[in-house]
Amino acid sequence: YAPTCGVAYPATESADDIAAAKKVYFGFENPMDNWTWNVAWFSDPVFLGEYPKEGLEKFADYLPEITEEDMQLIHQPLDFVGQNIYNGYMIRCGADGDPEYVDRAPGTAKTGTGWPVTPEALYYGIRFLTERYRLPLYITENGMSDLDNISADGQVHDRERITFLDAYLGAVQRAINEGMPVIGYFLWTFLDNFEWAEGYKERFGLVYVDYTTQRRIAKDSAYWYREVMRMNGENLSCNQPYKQILFMEP
């Protein structure tokens, strides 16, 4: 059980902005076709044994009868929370006290899929989920698609993916350093593959796959990630004196 969602994260680390982001993350203000509402709607029944009142009111016209027997079946003792987190959106507390969406500056980084690069979302996703459900947590998916190509030297040089993963893993380490019970992180993904929504268009893998010949080429990020695992994260830029990324060559 691992929902996917965008994370509302605060524009600053002020208490007001953090509270506003948390309200939006677990709230129901977004359109019904937006995945941002799935956090509390899907996870509260499983972990807390009840549907959020706000969601019951919003979806009242579409819901079947929810019985006590339903909730007994849904609400089971689980060992951990699993969450897929790729990106998020910035929220601040407005002058009237209500949450406001903050536009990203033009030219800020995006992945090949067009998703924003927002490592803050991973930290605050972990933090907010831990505070709400009080269980150990796995990040069950995180990664990025890029426009990977084989270079003239026969290698795949995906520095953007290394930069992305360095920032997101730094966010995970911050959460761990602050005492949050992160017990695992799963990178999406090892091999370029058929993505359920985009087919072969998007390449998320650490290993490049030639879909015609099935040839595999380890990308630069694969060598870098090997060292991250070997060194238990000590080569992440957040652990370096000048915050530099230690790129690993094949």
Regions flagged by a language model, labelled:
Residues Y1-P250:
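Active-site region of glycoside hydrolase catalytic domains
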